[in-house]
Amino acid sequence: MQDALTAISADHAPGRSQGSERLRLIWRNIFPFVVVGAIWEIIAWSGIFPRRLFPTLEDVVSSFVNLTITGILPHHAIDTLIRLLSGFALAAIAGVTVGVLMGRSRRAEDILLPLVSIGAPIPGLAYAPLFLLWFGLGNLSSVLLVGFVSAFPIIFNSWTGVKAVKEIWVRSAQAMGADDRRLFRHVIFPGALPYILTGLRLGLAQAWRILVAVEMLAAVPWGLGWLIFGARKFLNTDTMMAGIVVIALIGLALEKFVFQKIENYTVVRWGMISS
């Protein structure tokens, strides 16, 4: 009987262990948000700031729910997401292409690196007036500006990644008869991919910053940036916070369901980085 109980206990122990580990992982992920939320509530109820300027979490959640139910918040979010993904797609294609070209060609590096080095430090908003004059008010100028500004970190990281590929990998592949196409596909690009993914993450963050700001300047009728700046005029801080929360949620979703999926399927599976 004792042996049977021991066997049953042993059978169920892994399940309990996995369940506990899952709970710890969930708690570890939400703990920072719990801390920030608690601090926010303390400040909101302390009276340091007027309630209208520093709403409670209840006010923010209420505004979020109301704007979502009425369809206003989803409309703004979808318009912003379309602009973001369109501009970021342009940046990703151009940035990776230019960065890889600079890393593989010394002549391209000599020509392009000074231009990229000059353009990258200039704040994105400094380019906004030019893009608005060239392409007019509306979506086109917003998308092109997002693509232009967010391409710089992608270029730099792609270039660095290609340069960081170990020479012994390249020589070994060449010794085994790999042509330039196979060398790039099986050695150069996989070796540079961790850097490229980092550049894409930085580029996406840059795209968010410039898009939210330029949505007001470009006089687009919808968008989270337009919503936030419009709410500021009427001191609707809860609406502003609701827009910021949506930006954070979209960013989190892109990180979890796009970047981490790509990372796990490639560089983690290849053993280049730990999960």
What role is predicted for each listed range?
Residues 117-153, 160-161:
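Generic hydrophobic transmembrane alpha-helix motif, especially the helices
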Residues 144, 148, 180-214, 238, ...:
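Transmembrane alpha-helices
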Residues 14-23, 46-89:
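Periplasmic/extracellular loop-to-transmembrane helix junction in inner-membrane transport proteins
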Residues 114, 157-199, 225:
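Short cytoplasmic-facing helical segments at TM-TM junctions of multi-pass membrane proteins
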Residues 64, 73-77, 81, 111-118, ...:
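Hydrophobic alpha-helical elements at and bordering transmembrane segments
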Residues 1-34, 256-275:
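Transmembrane alpha-helical segments of polytopic membrane transport and secretion proteins
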Residues 86-116:
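Transmembrane-helix boundary motif in ABC transporter permease subunits
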Residues 224-262:
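Hydrophobic alpha-helical transmembrane segments of polytopic membrane proteins
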